[in-house]
């Protein structure tokens, strides 16, 4: 499948505004905070729902394209570098704190939720989110899980 058809199929899943494919758009996603290595993905997809993520992953699997999940890109590990082009799934739009269960001391959050937002929403219950990287105002829970 050509790149134009791939972009069309991705747009059919998440909408045209949620697919980046122009070089100037992709440059933002060529690396994380580890800037010594850089690779451009073929496309970046910005899903809003789990169903959209599933559909993108199924499409990429069918086409044998690598996928690169990405949080906020604050890691210093180079873990979000595109491999052989590939489709980057940037999860920053899936960013809600869905529930803080103070009684059981846990929260349900989406993968793109920023660490500091979890603490913000837990604070009224006398709780906080313990991981405290220097990037807590930008890094996401999905990136935390992927990196650690």
Question: What are these language model-derived features?
Answer:
Residues 77-80, 87-91:
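Short, acidic (Asp/Glu-rich) active-site segment that either coordinates a divalent metal cofactor
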Residues 33-36, 78-83:
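Short glycine-biased active-site loop of nucleotidyltransferases that positions the nucleotide triphosphate
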Residues 26-27, 77-78, 135-142:
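A glycine-rich phosphate-binding loop feature that marks nucleotide/adenosyl-phosphate handling sites
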Residues 148:
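Active-site-proximal helix/loop microenvironment
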Residues 10, 36-67, 85, 91-133, ...:
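N-terminal glycine-rich flavin-associated loop
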Residues 3-7, 115, 138:
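Alpha-helix initiation and N-capping motif
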Residues 1-33, 62-65:
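N-terminal accessory segments
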């Amino acid at each position: 499948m050509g790149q134009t058809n791939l972009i069309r199929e991705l747009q059919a899943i998440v909408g045209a505004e949620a697919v980046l494919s122009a070089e100037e758009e992709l440059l933002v996603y060529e690396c994380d905070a580890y800037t010594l290595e850089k690779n451009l993905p073929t496309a970046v997809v910005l899903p809003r729902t789990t169903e959209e993520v599933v559909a993108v992953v199924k499409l990429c699997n069918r086409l044998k394209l690598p996928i690169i999940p990405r949080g906020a890109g604050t890691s210093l590990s180079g873990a979000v570098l595109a491999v052989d082009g590939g489709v980057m799934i940037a999860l920053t739009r899936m960013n809600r704190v869905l529930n803080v269960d103070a009684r059981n001391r846990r929260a349900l959050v989406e993968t793109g939720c920023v660490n500091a937002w979890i603490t913000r929403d837990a604070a009224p219950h006398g709780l906080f989110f313990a991981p405290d990287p220097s990037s807590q105002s930008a890094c996401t829970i999905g990136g935390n899980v992927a990196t650690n």
